[in-house]
Structure formats: structure tokens, C-alpha cells
């Protein structure tokens, strides 16, 4: 069993890896945090307290997990790599408020796990250094399930984080921005250098905060259909929405006039590009489309 010193230092991380003969798997995007200051910034941004339940994805050797355990009521961590379970049993042995589930977060029954382990928590936050290769599927999977999550403070590839937080009209703004901002209010916490990881990743990192909205930003009757319609506007970013929707709809080329009429009734200039349309603009398009049964996809 380890003593109560912080895990997130180069020397202690290396000692743990040597003790267990652990080798990093590139395919799992394993990069462990070795800077306690960064972890403290993440904890501070999370606003967790003794009544908070935390979901962590990819705890690794427990560098962030131990700090979460010191601040939160309970921590529920999902770790896909079986080789790390003995390490976590060691590093987290001082804490009786942590449950580690050895399962792929994209295949796990998260709702059931939350009901079993975090049911007595007043607030639930997702706090994690996410595996960069599956950041987007993880976030969308959590947001689109009926799980009572209040917010997320998550580390990810800088480029992806900038897309989540992008403003209308910016180069980074796209369909991912729309989905995430539909569900949450987004903000940047801090940029993280490569040097605070072992091994250093190939990309720069960012921590973002996403707080769940009490109500989605706009009201639509079918979220999946709404997101598909919005995504189609970005199919070819250099093309106008008129061109993109002609390619998106079945027989769109034969319905050019109908598409123009639809855009006009929604108050959207057909010469605009997808990146200039707000979520509210896409909601107008979605509602107006119901008046044009010819526009199928």
C-alpha cells in the first residue's frame, strides 16, 4: 500500500509503473498526469464537495482519482485496462468512497452504475482526463442518456475542446459545437502543456467545463433528426447551405426550388455557410422543414 503522498509526480508515477511492470498502450490513449497543480485546478473548477458524486473515465493509476476521493462523497471510476486494476487497488486503498469498474465506458450500463453507487449524492459531476481517441463518443453518450449529470470538467485534445466551446462564425464551430451547446453551457478552464503527462501526448490539451442546462437551448421534438439536419449543413464547409442541403436530401437536385422556398420561409439566406448559423437558426430550419414533405433524406 502506498502512503498518502500525491501520486501525480514524475518520480512516484515512475515508481508505480516499475513496481507493476506497466507498459503504456498507445491504442488506449494512455497519458498519465504528473502535475498536482493541474489536478488541483481541475478539482477547483469542478466545485465538488462532500455531497458530490463523481464519475471518472480512465483513472489510469489514480492520480486524479485520489484527489477526487479526498473532496467528493463518492467516486465511480470506469477503467477499460485490466492491467491497471491492481495498481488502482493499491493507490486507492486508503479511500473507501471509490468504486472502480473494469469496463469500457461506451459499453457499460452507466445509468445502472450511477443508481447503484451515487444514488445518495446531491450532485453528480463527470471529472476526467478523457482518452483522446474517444472523447467525442464518450461525451455524446453521456449527454444523450437519461443520467442525472449536473456538469463535466474534462481534459481533452485542445482542438476538440475548442470545437465544443466554439462561437458561431468561428473556424472551429461545427456540428459538435451544436450538440454539446444544445445540452450544456461551455467554458474553457485552462490550456495544459504536453510536459505534464507521462508519456507526453502528441497534441496540446485543454480542460473545459460543461454545465448541464436545466432545459435544452432550443425545443425540438426529435433531437436525433435535429442534429442530423444541422450536421448536413457542415458536410462540405466551403459550400453554401443551399448546396449542402441539395446533396443531403433525397432527390435534392430535383427539389432545388423547394429547398430555396424552405430556406426563405425560415428566414435563412441560401448563400450562407453552415458555420454562420446559430442553434436557433437550425431550430427554425427544423420546424419549417415539417411544411415541406418533399424534403426527405
Swiss-Prot record:
Principal subcellular localisation of the protein: cytoplasm
Membrane-crossing residue ranges in chain numbering: none
Binding of S-adenosyl-L-methionine, residues: 31, 33, 58, 79, 104, 129
Compartments where located: Cytoplasm
Gene Ontology molecular functions: 16S rRNA (adenine(1518)-N(6)/adenine(1519)-N(6))-dimethyltransferase activity; RNA binding
UniProt KW keywords: Cytoplasm, Methyltransferase, RNA-binding, rRNA processing, S-adenosyl-L-methionine, Transferase
Source taxon at top rank: Bacteria
EC number per UniProt: 2.1.1.182
Reaction(s) catalysed (UniProt annotation): adenosine(1518)/adenosine(1519) in 16S rRNA + 4 S-adenosyl-L-methionine = N(6)-dimethyladenosine(1518)/N(6)-dimethyladenosine(1519) in 16S rRNA + 4 S-adenosyl-L-homocysteine + 4 H(+)
PANTHER family: DIMETHYLADENOSINE TRANSFERASE (PTHR11727), DIMETHYLADENOSINE TRANSFERASE-RELATED (PTHR11727:SF7)
NCBIfam families: ksgA (TIGR00755)
Protein's recorded name: Ribosomal RNA small subunit methyltransferase A
Species annotation: Staphylococcus aureus (strain Newman)
Amino acid at each position: 500500500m502506498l502512503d498518502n503522498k500525491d501520486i501525480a509526480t514524475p518520480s512516484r508515477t515512475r515508481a508505480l509503473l516499475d513496481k507493476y511492470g506497466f507498459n503504456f498502450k498507445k491504442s488506449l490513449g494512455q497519458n498519465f498526469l504528473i502535475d498536482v497543480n493541474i489536478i488541483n485546478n481541475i478539482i477547483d473548477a469542478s466545485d465538488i464537495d462532500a455531497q458530490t458524486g463523481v464519475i471518472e473515465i480512465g483513472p489510469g493509476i489514480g492520480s486524479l482519482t485520489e484527489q477526487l476521493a479526498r473532496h467528493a462523497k463518492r467516486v465511480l471510476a470506469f477503467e477499460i485496462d485490466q492491467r491497471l486494476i491492481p495498481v488502482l487497488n493499491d493507490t486507492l486503498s486508503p479511500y473507501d468512497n471509490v468504486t472502480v469498474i473494469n469496463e469500457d465506458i461506451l459499453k457499460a450500463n452507466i445509468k445502472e452504475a450511477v443508481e447503484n453507487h451515487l444514488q445518495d449524492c446531491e450532485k453528480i459531476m463527470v471529472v476526467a482526463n478523457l482518452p483522446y481517441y474517444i472523447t467525442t463518443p464518450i461525451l455524446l453518450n453521456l449527454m444523450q442518456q437519461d443520467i442525472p449529470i449536473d456538469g463535466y470538467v474534462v481534459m481533452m485534445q485542445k482542438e476538440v475542446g475548442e470545437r465544443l466551446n466554439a462561437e458561431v462564425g468561428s473556424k472551429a464551430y461545427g456540428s459538435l459545437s451544436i450538440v454539446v451547446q444544445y445540452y450544456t453551457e461551455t467554458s474553457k478552464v485552462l490550456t495544459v502543456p504536453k510536459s505534464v503527462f507521462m508519456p507526453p501526448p502528441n497534441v496540446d490539451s485543454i480542460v473545459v467545463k460543461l454545465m448541464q442546462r436545466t432545459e435544452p437551448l432550443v425545443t425540438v421534438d426529435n433531437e436525433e433528426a435535429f442534429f442530423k439536419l444541422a450536421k448536413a449543413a457542415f458536410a462540405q464547409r466551403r459550400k453554401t447551405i443551399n448546396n449542402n442541403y441539395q446533396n443531403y436530401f433525397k432527390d435534392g437536385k430535383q427539389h432545388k426550388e423547394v429547398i430555396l422556398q424552405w430556406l426563405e420561409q425560415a428566414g435563412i439566406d441560401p448563400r450562407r455557410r453552415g458555420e454562420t448559423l446559430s442553434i436557433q437558426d437550425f431550430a427554425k430550419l427544423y420546424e419549417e422543414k415539417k411544411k415541406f414533405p418533399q424534403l426527405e433524406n
